[in-house]
Curated annotation (Swiss-Prot):
Annotated NCBIfam families: PRK00405.1, rpoB
Protein name: DNA-directed RNA polymerase subunit beta
Enzyme nomenclature, EC number: 2.7.7.6
Gene giving rise to this polypeptide: rpoB
Entry-annotated residues carrying N6-acetyllysine: K1022, K1200
Organism of derivation: Escherichia fergusonii (strain ATCC 35469 / DSM 13698 / CCUG 18766 / IAM 14443 / JCM 21226 / LMG 7866 / NBRC 102419 / NCTC 12128 / CDC 0568-73)
Subunit (UniProt): The RNAP catalytic core consists of 2 alpha, 1 beta, 1 beta' and 1 omega subunit. When a sigma factor is associated with the core the holoenzyme is formed, which can initiate transcription.
PANTHER family cross-referenced by the UniProt entry: DNA-DIRECTED RNA POLYMERASE I SUBUNIT 2
Family indicated by similarity: Belongs to the RNA polymerase beta chain family.
Uppermost EC category: transferase
Matching SUPFAM superfamilies: beta and beta-prime subunits of DNA dependent RNA-polymerase
Cellular component annotations (GO), alphabetically ordered: DNA-directed RNA polymerase complex
Key words of the record: Acetylation, DNA-directed RNA polymerase, Nucleotidyltransferase, Transcription, Transferase
GO biological process, one term: DNA-templated transcription
Keyword Coiled coil: no
Amino acid sequence: MVYSYTEKKRIRKDFGKRPQVLDVPYLLSIQLDSFQKFIEQDPEGQYGLEAAFRSVFPIQSYSGNSELQYVSYRLGEPVFDVQECQIRGVTYSAPLRVKLRLVIYEREAPEGTVKDIKEQEVYMGEIPLMTDNGTFVINGTERVIVSQLHRSPGVFFDSDKGKTHSSGKVLYNARIIPYRGSWLDFEFDPKDNLFVRIDRRRKLPATIILRALNYTTEQILDLFFEKVIFEIRDNKLQMELVPERLRGETASFDIEANGKVYVEKGRRITARHIRQLEKDDVKLIEVPVEYIAGKVVAKDYIDESTGELICAANMELSLDLLAKLSQSGHKRIETLFTNDLDHGPYISETLRVDPTNDRLSALVEIYRMMRPGEPPTREAAESLFENLFFSEDRYDLSAVGRMKFNRSLLRDEIEGSGILSKDDIIDVMKKLIDIRNGKGEVDDIDHLGNRRIRSVGEMAENQFRVGLVRVERAVKERLSLGDLDTLMPQDMINAKPISAAVKEFFGSSQLSQFMDQNNPLSEITHKRRISALGPGGLTRERAGFEVRDVHPTHYGRVCPIETPEGPNIGLINSLSVYAQTNEYGFLETPYRKVIDGVVTDEIHYLSAIEEGNYVIAQANSNLDEEGHFVEDLVTCRSKGESSLFSRDQVDYMDVSTQQVVSVGASLIPFLEHDDANRALMGANMQRQAVPTLRADKPLVGTGMERAVAVDSGVTAVAKRGGVVQYVDASRIVIKVNEDEMYPGEAGIDIYNLTKYTRSNQNTCINQMPCVSLGEPVERGDVLADGPSTDLGELALGQNMRVAFMPWNGYNFEDSILVSERVVQEDRFTTIHIQELACVSRDTKLGPEEITADIPNVGEAALSKLDESGIVYIGAEVTGGDILVGKVTPKGETQLTPEEKLLRAIFGEKASDVKDSSLRVPNGVSGTVIDVQVFTRDGVEKDKRALEIEEMQLKQAKKDLSEELQILEAGLFSRIRAVLVAGGVEAEKLDKLPRDRWLELGLTDEEKQNQLEQLAEQYDELKHEFEKKLEAKRRKITQGDDLAPGVLKIVKVYLAVKRRIQPGDKMAGRHGNKGVISKINPIEDMPYDENGTPVDIVLNPLGVPSRMNIGQILETHLGMAAKGIGDKINAMLKQQQEVAKLREFIQRAYDLGADVRQKVDLSTFSDEEVMRLAENLRKGMPIATPVFDGAKEAEIKELLKLGDLPTSGQIRLYDGRTGEQFERPVTVGYMYMLKLNHLVDDKMHARSTGSYSLVTQQPLGGKAQFGGQRFGEMEVWALEAYGAAYTLQEMLTVKSDDVNGRTKMYKNIVDGNHQMEPGMPESFNVLLKEIRSLGINIELEDE
């Protein structure tokens, strides 16, 4: 395997056995591809903005003599880049400009004669743009649009499973769901009549819809029934025989023909009888006259002579009617073929309950149902019905819907119209009747072939279309108003409705969510999330068990593990590692093709529907060298079931063992040894891990860490290979390799790093370079680590030395005992950054002012503010400190004569303002790391704002000039090369100042041309620099666009360092969570023979009942990894020669049976081996992929190599007494995370504070500075103790007895410790409520 430069620094030993056929795909592609499809111009007009425009335009006037046509659109450049948008609190978006053409036709001339054409580009609002990492910046905050899993459009056949009717009869129904438009449902009732509903309204007999489609009774019967034909010959009744129809019936008369009796009366007709009848080719048999009674006529019979109707279609025959028919000369009678088994009389029965008899009455019935209370007219009824399912504007099945519809009805073509046809409706009814007759199956709506993914692009397009349709109405009216000669397209389009629709979607849709930015994993998982909730989806309350359950089709598409606990379980899922969506939006997963029993590396992506037709082997099936299956019987999946198949039946094989799980679950080592419930918690808790001060890669990982870290976008990744030319904390400069340069560019890539910025969850985002000067890098190499990444690998927590043993009850109930060393070494110290904002507004009484001159505040409180009243950067502040001084004008108060006198003498005016400064919230303390001042245009900037501006300008200038210098240096080195090649001596050249080089002339014409080109580039560079600097200067100095009424905003950023402390929540990766109970001194912790104390003591009782054994295996393997690191460390300390190191490290990498990873250290230089060893001294990182991990034997081998006991247990000694514990203890290294549930954010205390208005009781919760509720169970406790006075105090003066409270306060101040309880306010509320019921209760004071 070829390792890149960064990977060589620390290679993870991989225990995976299965070959990696397919690399993990780019993890954010579901978001990026979808949005790309939305904004890029699609010449076919299938997707995105183009499709939306084409569906609405051209817009024609009502009169038809003018129309507005769409030509093309373009997106402009965003005004601010992503970082600026976040700082300023604006949306990162680009203006949308659309070219429209207004065509005016001649009125009197023949149709289509053009009078005038005007073309113009029209602004249509802003379209939010996606950042490179798949997020949107909306009003300065990063948001993610979650994909939605909704029911695919198409037709679905379902049953109520016997739950609707008390008899338990199964009622079948069919539902046609369009992408947009009215739903059409067909359903059976318990009497077996077929009904139809439109948009889930009241039901009508299904034949009404057929009548509305202009079918007569005769035609309807013709469509749905086979015929039985009777003939009257020589006063005998004969029936045309179709032998197959008799199967299973009991003969009610002798069946005979040609004198031979085939079936005797009363006998059951069997397949043998039918074969005989067919063999003898019997066409007609004689039947008794009574047999026809009760049969149903298939058409109208009219007496030719009188024109009178003898019997209408769908009437039951009686013997009288038969006689009448015979008399009037009808010798051939067609009846409907029905039986109780597989040809039910449903449509015939439905026609009997159908009140309508022609098209008009059917249309009127439908109109009455859709618009109750409105008088129907013929035109209204017709247009309503036409618009329901047959109008392109109101109804669209979409390409997906049509494909699913045709597949469901077993048609050959998969394309077709987006509206319904007569055939569509009839075919659905036929199939539904077939299912009722026992032919065919109902659909499974939880099958992933019936649910599809709607991603960002599609949802944004729908929203945009909604906006356009709103505009369309207005445009139509404007076009009809006349006087078009002076109008331009711009005057017709109002961009407000469009931008409002888009803004509403991105800002407040249920699926537009505040990005979870705790750590890189939580970002990636949030973008790969799939929700069944949201507009057009399910609701929590209505979703039953089936929808939430794991379905066989989830395999490889949706993760069976990662889903929230609680009310959303199973409704919010995560995309599997390799899954992607196909053109129709269905999830597909990759498989390896098996050809003639040989597994190839050819990859096919299959959707859930396609997968049902194949036999698919598991990824862990054993293969030989050529790719044949080793075993004769292979475990495979087929049609949702798992069973054994012979090896020549296999069609496909899984691509990878981690194909089943999501990114979050694929990071849990030994997942295969954990119970699923705990694995779910483990996957969810990794997303809550707070990035620690120094990231520490997991010793035991799964090999997915690198993919997650790189794809999440928190690291800086090299766009092109080259050599590191410059590196400091905030930027990295790469001189690009010659072969990767574009012709005529300087070949310098500059990466500016993010420093100490705040994430959505108030954690700290900071990038640190992990390359050094002169290092070669390749494209895709990690240049700088972000939060929670370590050398380009995801590192959410810390490797801790843990022991599983009880320790004095401090690990009771999942508590965790932590050594003081962990605190000393700052292993779990995290930085949190808070943003506090102070807004100065224009009030009715005058503007608020930001100033250091605040009334009634001492000098000490102002010591940290500058003269503008804003806190200094670097100041350490605690709760209650002033950060920004602000005064608000106060209303004029009535002054006493004395005050008036003083005013007159001293001109004192200070009491007109009140202090409304921004203070640090209680319980928060930290360091000010940044201050930003935003000033409205036209408001004078204060001194601090100007200082910040000056600083930013300086920084921008410095950045740009450094960039220019680097680029110049690159350019001049190329100029020098050209000059030297052209015959100029190098020494002379170096004596000349560089600017003069370009004036030199060369005799070689080609070289001279090159030189001139380079000179042009140099001029361009300088010009570009000036332009960039000017743009930057303009951006920095221009006023900010603030909300109306806001003059100034000051934002202060506080950094808070939080050490780990009792009450913080910690967890491993296997769902093993707990709260820290005590920080124990190092000397009291259990220690081993070498005197090494453990860091954490966990309770062994937390393992067996929870069945997450993965944590034990991780502990053992972590111990082995650390043991090998210790040996390497010892060798380095002894300064042993490189060869020995190389040999030992090679042995460690080669360990394990037939692992896929082959590390060949002989290709590494000595320097590289030394660097590798240096990075391995803290432990050799190990990958144990999900379902393909290290075996127990391999762990033991590794322990042996590290000179450790293969049991994984060692003798420990009690730190307090020095005595040995009575039995060996499992000790090892486990990766522990600190979760974002910190005791600092939860701890809260109150003495007095705010009260609720109505009940006068204290509020609840930390945010409201509330009290602790003394609830009814606590009252019972005090009652049980008989503590009457304590209880009285609790319910009166300590709660809501207003007078008692104030009196008590007064008494305490006076030193008189007595109390008089009064009437609690909540009792008065109760009295008022009872009075509202009309019962008067009064309290009589005796």
